[in-house]
């Protein structure tokens, strides 16, 4: 009887304790248990800035972060809280199903269950990587690349983890999953990449909270900014003097000891930089981290490395400072466009010289028609020597209108985006057999190689290499634009931004990204017309130019 009474007493106490929890931070401290490198019950001691994030009352929250600042654990705790306390279905989105969602399930979710007796009790089915059940409540884990995976899962809580690495055009589909719920809580977190894209685009619409704390020396409220609060020692990343770099209070100039951060940051608060914004935003750099890997000496070595190559430059600003950054020359600028405006107006028809056309396919068919000026003596890469004159750039609704453009401008060769209207694009290519190819951006193609399929209707190219060439013309001033060029064209060619990364072998690689709401159709039409040039030359420019039957 005593054992039964004790059990009932324990359950009543547990129930009362459970009902007293009204904040995610309380839930985390009560029920979350962590593994290495900080094993034991959840604590805010090493990451005090996370408490305010946990307990945000906003419906829409944005976290623009440096790497390894605890934001993922925060949104995971918030997810568990709403599943456990409110019984709300949640959708947790990662960049890709494989390996991201699979790794998240194995490395984050499953250990959280194994280490917490409370979570073991509430989750009844955890075997499915993409679907975890807690009684009648569901946690869906999805990759952003699969549209089907983001459909038919109505949820009240949505988490986008590493938004900048996601397929941006599928994000609105994930948001639509909340339309049927009375409670709609959203968290978007990510290390940023470039301005006005991904997480930064949303963060700029938020309160942009900064973490302030009391200086242990002068007691004034301060925040940490680079380079204002950093004393930089040494001259390069291998200089041992760099280890002497340290953080200071910019008000009293006293040193802030790295080992003491966990104490003087403890009672800090988030202070909004902007008021009357629709979203609650949190931004923080690694200068706040008390981790050994974030010691000021190591931080400054990363800063010195950033001066040596664009990949480390990008990495320092994004992962260390938690700030977006555009490396010089990474995007087309207004000044470059202005410098390329010629004396001509757009043509209505044209019948002289070598002419190509590129078409990007979407709701509209965006096209660019180019006349090429080729010197008498050229090398094997004709694009390097040729100068381009844009004689018309615009958009139309139907492929039949492209037929008229082919005829009126005597287009020698055209390259058309093969998706999403592959059937219509193929029919167009068949009508102009030998003078039109469908283009696919593919893998396994290096440099400016063009892989032509056996049917010779499809070509596969490396996206980054060709965009480097086609958009690089604006910087090199090897392209002439009409004076009546549309603002839409200018906006589209400015949309792609080249970001720099290192692959698994440490080699420098680049790729182009754009904002969720940005359009780059004319940029790709420009690219396809560039690809059409060597195809036109290889097939001969003296072919019969009559329109198809």
Task: Please give the residue ranges for each predicted region.
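Phosphate/NTP-binding elements of NTP-utilizing enzymes
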Residues: 1-355, 359, 407-419, 430-432
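Charge-patterned, long linear interaction tracts outside catalytic cores
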Residues: 477-548
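Compositionally biased, low-complexity linear motifs
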Residues: 70, 85-86, 373-379, 537-539
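Mg2+-dependent endonuclease catalytic cores in nucleic-acid-processing enzymes, primarily RNase H-like
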Residues: 61, 103-104, 237-240, 244-255, ...
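Hydrophobic alpha-helix feature that most strongly marks membrane-spanning transmembrane helices
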Residues: 84, 179-182, 407, 475, ...
């Amino acid at each position: 009887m005593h054992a039964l009474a004790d059990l009932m007493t324990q359950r009543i106490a547990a129930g009362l304790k459970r009902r007293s929890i009204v904040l995610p931070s309380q839930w985390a401290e009560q029920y979350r248990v962590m593994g290495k490198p900080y094993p034991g019950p959840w604590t805010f001691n090493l990451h005090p800035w996370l408490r305010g994030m946990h307990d945000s009352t906003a419906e829409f929250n944005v976290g623009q972060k440096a790497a390894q600042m605890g934001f993922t654990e925060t949104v995971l705790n918030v997810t568990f809280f709403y599943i456990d306390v409110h019984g709300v279905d949640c959708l947790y989105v990662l960049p890709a199903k494989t390996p991201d969602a699979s790794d998240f399930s194995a490395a984050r979710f499953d250990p959280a269950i194994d280490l917490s007796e409370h979570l073991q009790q509430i989750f009844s089915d955890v075997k499915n990587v993409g679907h975890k059940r807690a009684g009648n409540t569901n946690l869906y884990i999805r990759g952003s690349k699969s549209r089907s995976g983001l459909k038919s899962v109505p949820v009240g809580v949505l988490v986008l983890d590493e938004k900048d690495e996601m397929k941006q055009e599928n994000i609105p589909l994930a948001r639509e999953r909340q339309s049927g719920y009375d409670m709609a809580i959203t968290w978007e977190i990510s290390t940023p990449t470039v301005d006005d894209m991904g997480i930064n685009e949303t963060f700029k619409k938020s309160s942009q909270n900064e973490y302030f704390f009391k200086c242990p020396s002068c007691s004034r409220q301060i925040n940490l900014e680079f380079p204002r609060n950093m004393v930089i020692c040494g001259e390069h990343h291998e200089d041992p003097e760099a280890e002497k770099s340290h953080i200071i209070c910019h008000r009293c100039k006293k040193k802030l000891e790295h080992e003491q951060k966990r104490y003087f940051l403890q009672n800090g608060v988030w202070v909004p930089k902007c008021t009357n914004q629709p979203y609650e935003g949190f931004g923080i750099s690694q200068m706040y981290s008390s981790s050994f890997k974030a010691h000021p000496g190591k931080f400054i070595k990363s800063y010195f490395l950033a001066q040596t190559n664009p990949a480390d430059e990008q990495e320092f600003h994004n992962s260390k400072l938690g700030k977006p950054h555009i490396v010089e020359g990474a995007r087309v600028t207004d000044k470059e466009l202005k410098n390329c405006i010629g004396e001509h107006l757009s043509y209505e028809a044209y019948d002289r010289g070598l002419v190509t056309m590129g078409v990007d396919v979407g709701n509209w068919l965006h096209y660019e028609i180019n006349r090429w000026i080729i010197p008498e003596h050229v090398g094997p890469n004709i694009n390097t020597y040729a100068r381009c004159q844009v004689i018309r750039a615009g958009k139309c609704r139907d492929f039949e209108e492209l037929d008229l453009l082919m005829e009126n401008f005597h287009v020698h060769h055209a390259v058309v985006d093969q998706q999403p209207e592959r059937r219509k694009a193929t029919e167009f290519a068949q009508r102009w057999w030998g003078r039109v190819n469908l283009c696919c951006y593919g893998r396994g193609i290096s440099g400016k190689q063009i892989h032509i399929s056996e049917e010779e209707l499809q070509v596969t190219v490396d996206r980054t290499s060709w965009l480097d060439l086609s958009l690089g013309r604006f910087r090199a001033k090897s392209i002439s634009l009409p004076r009546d060029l549309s603002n839409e064209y200018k906006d589209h060619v400015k949309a792609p931004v080249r970001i720099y990364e290192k692959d698994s072998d440490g080699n420098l690689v680049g790729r182009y990204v754009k904002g969720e709401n940005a359009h780059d159709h004319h940029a790709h039409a420009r690219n396809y017309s560039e690809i059409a040039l060597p195809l036109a030359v290889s097939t001969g420019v003296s072919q019969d130019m009559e329109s198809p039957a």
